[in-house]
Amino acid sequence: MSHYHEQFLKQNPLAVLGVLRDLHKAAIPLRLSWNGGQLISKLLAITPDKLVLDFGSQAEDNIAVLKAQHITITAETQGAKVEFTVEQLQQSEYLQLPAFITVPPPTLWFVQRRRYFRISAPLHPPYFCQTKLADNSTLRFRLYDLSLGGMGALLETAKPAELQEGMRFAQIEVNMGQWGVFHFDAQLISISERKVIDGKNETITTPRLSFRFLNVSPTVERQLQRIIFSLEREAREKADKVRD
């Protein structure tokens, strides 16, 4: 997660505690990962100087994590991904049941997801995508916008009759120029229309596709994050030049 943009790093103690309290209140599952293992837990209690975590379901994992150092804790909420590291866990009790305790982290990553960050793809050069339909024909389209959770695309031809919302596609090829070629499993969430007025004051209607990415690996997610912020920076620089 250190590869994410620094704006996602929470360093204020009150902000860190606020995120942790939200995880506790919503009973969000936590994944504890260390060198050689992982387990699923949840926050049982939180104070400014103590975190109480539930024991995992497997005794051998609980024993192993107590011996581990530099434990990474991650959580997935509807709007964000949370990740932080603690140096070590100690065994304790909570409500007369075994539990882990540790001190709250000084910082944590709070990476906001799809509905918060969506960046338009550049018009020049355009980024093109392609995938296969059920009849083995090739469907080509242009990347319109991009987020960690999915992408929007524009068809340059009429919508094929067999293209329906809810369809899943394996390994859609997305050519993002200087960033390289990526392949995503994705589900078609919606089909709509993009309408613009051209220079002749005529309405141009283009089929618009919205995809949700499936099974994106952490490595690819980090690459997407870097691309999104680079595109955002380039767009901001162009806007500044126009204003100047």
Swiss-Prot record:
Keywords: Bacterial flagellum, c-di-GMP, Nucleotide-binding. Coiled coil: none annotated. InterPro entries: PilZ_domain (IPR009875), Split_barrel_FMN-bd (IPR012349), T3SS_YcgR (IPR023787), T3SS_YcgR_PilZN (IPR009926). Disruption phenotype: No visible motility phenotype. Disruption of this gene suppresses the reduced motility of a pdeH disruption, thus the double disruption is motile. The keyword Nucleotide-binding applies. It is found in: Bacterial flagellum basal body. The keyword Nucleotide-binding applies. Gene3D superfamilies: Electron Transport, Fmn-binding Protein, Chain A (2.30.110.10), predicted glycosyltransferase like domains (2.40.10.220). Changing residue 62 to W: Significant suppression of the pdeH disruption motility phenotype, less binding to FliG. GO terms for cellular component: bacterial-type flagellum basal body. One of its GO terms (biological process) is regulation of bacterial-type flagellum-dependent cell motility by regulation of motor speed. Changing residue 223 to W: Significant suppression of the pdeH disruption motility phenotype. It comes from the Bacteria. Residues 112-230 form the PilZ domain. GO terms for molecular function: cyclic-di-GMP binding. Monomer. Interacts with MotA in the flagellar basal bodies. In another study it was not seen to interact with MotA, but instead with FliM and FliG, also in the flagellar basal body. Belongs to the YcgR family. The N-terminal domain is involved in FliG binding, the C-terminal domain is involved in FliM binding. Acts as a flagellar brake, regulating swimming and swarming in a bis-(3'-5') cyclic diguanylic acid (c-di-GMP)-dependent manner. When bound to c-di-GMP it binds to elements of the flagellar motor (MotA and/or FliG and FliM, binding to FliM also occurs in the absence of c-di-GMP), causing the motor to slow down. Thus, increasing levels of c-di-GMP lead to decreased motility. Probably binds 1 c-di-GMP dimer per subunit. This is Flagellar brake protein YcgR. The gene is ycgR.
